[in-house]
Amino acid sequence: MGKEKIHINIVVIGHVDSGKSTTTGHLIYKCGGIDKRTIEKFEKEAQEMGKGSFKYAWVLDKLKAERERGITIDIALWKFETSKYYVTIIDAPGHRDFIKNMITGTSQADCAVLIVAAGTGEFEAGISKNGQTREHALLAFTLGVKQLIVGVNKMDSTEPPYSEARYEEIKKEVSSYIKKIGYNPASVAFVPISGWHGDNMLEPSEKMPWFKGWSVERKEGKAEGKCLIDALDAILPPQRPTDKPLRLPLQDVYKIGGIGTVPVGRVETGLLKPGMVVNFAPVNLVTEVKSVEMHHEALTEAMPGDNVGFNVKNVSVKELRRGYVAGDSKNNPPRGAADFTAQVIVLNHPGQIANGYTPVLDCHTAHIACKFSEIKEKCDRRTGKTTETEPKAIKSGDAAIIVLVPSKPLCVESFQEFPPLGRFAVRDMRQTVAVGVIKSVNFKETTSGKVTKAAEKAQKKK
């Protein structure tokens, strides 16, 4: 077997008809986890429904429909391999809760792949003020996805087909607007592709002899290649934050007969080990971890990215809930927030937002109403420079520095220190109206919570 490939996560973004599904479907289809039988079944169904021309997107639609219905489909279907990486597509837009998912995201994307359509009029629609292209790219950047690849899709439908001039025009335009957002175009690979015909997807296309390949420059060195798959191979591997203090937001808490209370969640930073004395914030409950397991196998330690269940002693299911955060009681344990200051970007709110506005925040696994207690300043989104102090109200398109006060105990962190616990979605009227990145947290004075007997024993042993 040799050494296992590194796992990376990508998010595919772009306007609704840019061909994201077809492009993603093509990669999964050609390099992915879908077995031949499933593909043949999909193809047959597609043909019967007269959707023969739609097979790659059809593959994705089938998967998406299953995901929408809440069937946890075989996650392998959303994976594909490059020569260097195992790639997981963590969410493809078009999904209703895409923006929320991207923020509270089960995992941080290492790279965003932006698909823009080259067809006449199509590119312009996607990039116009109300197209989704800008919003998606802005979100990716705001949420710390610093690597970007741009696929200029549907090159087969330009006038004339596979037009170099059209590609160059789009490249120039996209470069200028991703630069406004904060990306450096020199470090972004641009590839002209056809997700449907397969041009420049996995191998260089004869139809675009003018394309000499993409190249990027970044402080980690240069990279170059011919097709989309090479660009994915050139993604810089993520640094998994094992050296930071433990943060594990709880997704669920189970009571398992004969074992006891088992909280479940994903290690975001640090390590979780059996025997560790953990602290659950914001309730400040301290207890010992008896065992840790993943996929029904006992672990000696769980690392960032691992979804685990762990058994805790002398704690009832009622004392823990989704949204609480576990940490190591001996190493900068998590605490509840009295209030926190964040940079908030308003995406789509029909009216004005003023002090006192109290929407629901989705931050990691927590879902809690928070009050905008003080809108301190409006700022330039890209540079962070103040443009107005103490504004009366803010509206769609504005970025502002705001002090928020949670209505119930809540555990959050600054984005700088613990990214997954420092970004949030603001939900109102069943949609994401704003996104935020936490600059600083004013922690509550820790009043000591319950310390279980198991924890006391474990602490004495040490």
Swiss-Prot record:
A molecular function (GO) term: GTPase activity
Modified residues (5-glutamyl glycerylphosphorylethanolamine): E301, E374
Naturally occurring in which organism (per UniProt): Drosophila melanogaster
Region (G1), start-end ranges: 14-21
Family recorded in the similarity comment: Belongs to the TRAFAC class translation factor GTPase superfamily. Classic translation factor GTPase family. EF-Tu/EF-1A subfamily.
G2: region residues: 70-74
This protein's UniProt keywords: Cytoplasm, Elongation factor, GTP-binding, Nucleotide-binding, Phosphoprotein, Protein biosynthesis
Residues that hold GTP according to the record: 14-21, 91-95, 153-156
One BP annotation, GO: translation
Chain's role: This protein promotes the GTP-dependent binding of aminoacyl-tRNA to the A-site of ribosomes during protein biosynthesis.
Disulfide bonds, paired cysteine numbers: none
Stored Pfam families: GTP-eEF1A_C (PF22594), GTP_EFTU (PF00009), GTP_EFTU_D2 (PF03144)
Region annotation G5: where it falls in the sequence: 194-196
Localization annotation: Cytoplasm
Entry's transmembrane regions: none
Region of interest (G3), residue spans: 91-94
Protein name, per record: Elongation factor 1-alpha 2
tr-type G domain ranges (all copies): 5-242
Region of interest (G4), ranges: 153-156
Gene behind the chain: eEF1alpha2
